């Protein structure tokens, strides 16, 4: 990570940290680095989520892009994977998404995609950061007819949905599915997609007002969706996050089905159909021990990366694997898209439920989860946790007590000023006790 770029683009409190001035510079410098590779009039597609700050930042970003001579196509409210897909499909030189994903409404972010639909490399981010920190802006300033134009392509969302439909066999007729759009990017796309596939749908989180994105709804708050599933006797529920790149499900009993379980279900189905490349799934170090044991029972291999879907994607690209993801619900199906895609994952999961004739609880129950506890602690310097001797000592103490029957992971968040403490153990009681023991030490020596 650099000075400006975190694990998922540039993020901050909108109009305070992520200002219109910075958005203009990101448009100008980012657009130049990505789009002006011998292309006289490069095309850049731009999408956003439903945050109140989105239009402000979009306007500034687009102005920066236009100042370099780029042609800009505004997609309006759309998902992050929708931007990635349309960047490739429309032969654009770059794509930009304005969103802070699952973060609260006051935050926003800007993430770039190259012409191939993949997020930026470290080298590209470093090049943009060097331009941001330069004493003088020496990039070309076209005038007159050489300036860029802007146009609206709000139909792009439905072009993306048409593609998603083509990735599954048949329809979803006979299923009743509860959908939670997080008052975000999927608020209209999800009901349209699943309805078009003949599913019976009920919804929450599909009435954005600019300020309610992720507010008690979506993939980080699936409790209301669980209630909706039970109240409406739905077959299962699907919860998306603010920008639609992750998915958490709820089974017919109201139990949460997380990214590990979804990956397990997809891997089992893909492997049985001969579609899982090298019988391999890529996950992060946060995936549950039960996930790995479940894959082993199916003779499916696994590979671990650092936390962050960008690292999952990097490993998948490096080794040509086609399924990977995170416990948080970022699931990457590389045969179909270049980034985590909640809608894509959702229709494939629904298709498996229909084809198998099993309930989602039966499918998810084939993987036994180890009790896991995760605590997020606000700190002034999140990276200092890696060198803190008090934290290191308590981790060793807990690991010695576990004696191999569990694991501990303490790490800085990639996007927020937090230290994340994760513990897995044989019992709920042990997991709770161990995570509290470590968290108390982190708070005492590092907390605000």
From Swiss-Prot:
Reactions catalysed: alpha-D-glucosamine 1-phosphate = D-glucosamine 6-phosphate
Binding site for Mg(2+): 101, 241, 243, 245
Cofactor(s) in the UniProt record: Mg(2+)
InterPro entries: A-D-PHexomutase_a/b/a-I, A-D-PHexomutase_a/b/a-I/II/III, A-D-PHexomutase_a/b/a-II, A-D-PHexomutase_a/b/a-III, A-D-PHexomutase_C, A-D-PHexomutase_C_sf, A-D-PHexomutase_CS, Alpha-D-phosphohexomutase_SF
Modification after translation (UniProt): Activated by phosphorylation.
A biological-process GO annotation: peptidoglycan biosynthetic process
Catalytic site: 101 (phosphoserine intermediate)
Keyword Ubl conjugation among record annotations: no
Biological function: Catalyzes the conversion of glucosamine-6-phosphate to glucosamine-1-phosphate.
UniProt family annotation: Belongs to the phosphohexose mutase family.
Protein name: Phosphoglucosamine mutase
Source organism phylogeny: Bacteria, Bacillati, Bacillota, Bacilli, Bacillales
């Amino acid at each position: 990570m650099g000075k400006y770029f975190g694990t998922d683009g540039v993020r901050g409190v909108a109009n305070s940290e992520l200002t219109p001035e910075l958005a203009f510079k990101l448009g100008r410098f980012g657009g130049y680095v990505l789009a002006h590779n011998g292309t006289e009039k490069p095309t850049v597609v731009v999408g956003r989520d439903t945050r109140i700050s989105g239009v402000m930042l979009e306007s500034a970003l687009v102005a920066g892009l236009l100042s370099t001579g780029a042609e800009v196509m505004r997609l309006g409210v759309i998902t992050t994977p929708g931007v990635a897909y349309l960047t490739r499909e429309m032969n654009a030189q770059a794509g930009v998404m304005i969103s802070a994903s699952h973060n609260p409404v006051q935050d926003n972010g800007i993430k770039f995609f190259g012409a191939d639909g993949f997020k930026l490399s470290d080298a590209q981010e470093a090049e943009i950061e060097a331009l941001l920190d330069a004493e003088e802006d020496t990039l070309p300033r076209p005038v007159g007819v050489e300036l860029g134009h802007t146009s609206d392509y709000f139909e792009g969302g439905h072009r993306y949905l048409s593609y998603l439909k083509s990735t599954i066999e048949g329809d979803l007729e006979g299923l009743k599915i509860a959908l939670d759009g997080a008052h975000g990017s999927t608020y209209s796309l999800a009901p349209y997609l699943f309805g078009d596939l003949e599913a019976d749908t009920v919804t929450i989180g599909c009435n954005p007002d600019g300020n309610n994105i992720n507010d008690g709804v979506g993939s980080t708050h699936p409790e209301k969706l669980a209630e909706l599933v039970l109240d409406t006797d739905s077959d299962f529920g699907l919860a998306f996050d603010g920008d639609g790149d992750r998915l958490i499900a709820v089974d017919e009993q109201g139990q949460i089905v997380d990214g590990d379980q979804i990956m397990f279900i997809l891997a089992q189905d893909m492997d049985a159909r001969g579609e899982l490349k090298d019988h391999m799934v890529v996950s992060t170090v946060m995936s549950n021990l039960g996930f790995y044991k479940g894959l082993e029972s199916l003779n499916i291999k696994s590979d671990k990366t650092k936390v962050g879907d960008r690292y999952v994607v990097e490993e998948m690209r490096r080794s040509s694997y086609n399924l990977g993801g995170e416990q948080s619900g970022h699931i990457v199906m590389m045969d179909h898209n270049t980034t985590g895609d909640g809608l894509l994952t959702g229709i494939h999961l629904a298709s498996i439920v229909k084809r198998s004739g099993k309930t989602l609880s039966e499918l998810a129950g084939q993987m036994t989860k180890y009790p896991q506890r995760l605590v997020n602690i606000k700190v002034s310097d999140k990276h200092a946790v890696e060198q803190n001797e008090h934290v290191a000592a308590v981790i060793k103490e807990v690991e010695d007590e576990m004696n191999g029957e569990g694991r501990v992971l303490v790490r800085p968040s990639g996007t927020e000023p937090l230290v994340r403490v994760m513990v897995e153990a044989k019992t709920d009681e042990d997991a709770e006790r161990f995570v509290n023991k470590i968290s108390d030490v982190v708070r005492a020596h590092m907390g605000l």
